[in-house]
C-alpha cells in the first residue's frame, strides 16, 4: 500500500526488485 513513486502505465515497475507491484497504474509496496 505504500507508493513507490513510479508509474506502470507504459512500462512495468522497475521498483519490483524492491518488492513493488503495479496497482491502478502506480507501483505500490504493501
Swiss-Prot record:
Disulfide bonds: 4-20, 8-22, 13-27
Post-translational changes noted in the entry: This is a cyclic peptide.
Keywords: Antiviral protein, Disulfide bond, Knottin, Plant defense
Crosslinked positions (Cyclopeptide (Gly-Asn)): 1-30
GO biological process, one term: defense response
Record-stated family: Belongs to the cyclotide family. Bracelet subfamily.
Its job: Probably participates in a plant defense mechanism. Inhibits the cytopathic effects of the human immunodeficiency virus.
The record's note on its domains: The presence of a 'disulfide through disulfide knot' structurally defines this protein as a knottin.
The name this protein goes by in its record: Circulin-C
Organism whose genome encodes this protein: Chassalia parviflora
Upper lineage: Eukaryota, Viridiplantae, Streptophyta, Embryophyta, Tracheophyta
Amino acid at each position: 500500500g505504500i507508493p513507490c513513486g513510479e508509474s506502470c502505465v507504459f512500462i512495468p515497475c522497475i521498483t519490483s526488485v524492491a518488492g513493488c507491484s503495479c496497482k491502478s497504474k502506480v507501483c505500490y509496496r504493501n
